[in-house]
A protein has these predicted regions:
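Short cationic/low-complexity microdomains
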Residues: 47-56
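Vicinal oxygen chelate
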Residues: 1-43, 50, 65-68, 78-80
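Acidic/histidine-enriched, glycine/proline-rich intrinsically disordered or flexible terminal extensions
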Residues: 55-81
Length: 81
């Protein structure tokens, strides 16, 4: 599921996880019926395909520490030098 804001990301995530679902890594979660979903902010997609490969790696490394994606943390990782 592609999202554009943290609020939208949170809404989808909470709707799935908050109703009998399970959290997993890197934006993945599973609903109560066992269907897996990845809630992916567009900012993450742009960050991990950033033309500055070092910035893209920082974004990827930040994502690997997350369950639900935190857009501000991804953007901070890209901005770090």
């Amino acid at each position: 599921v592609a999202t554009t804001t943290q609020e939208e990301t949170d809404r989808y995530w909470n709707a799935i996880v908050g109703h009998g679902g399970q959290e997993s890594a890197c934006g993945w979660c599973k609903d109560r019926w066992g269907v897996s979903w990845q809630i992916t902010p567009m900012q993450l997609t742009r960050a991990i395909t950033h033309p500055d490969r070092a910035a893209a790696k920082r974004a990827f490394d930040a994502m690997m520490t997350m369950r639900k994606i935190d857009i501000a943390a991804i953007e901070a990782a890209v901005a770090r030098r």
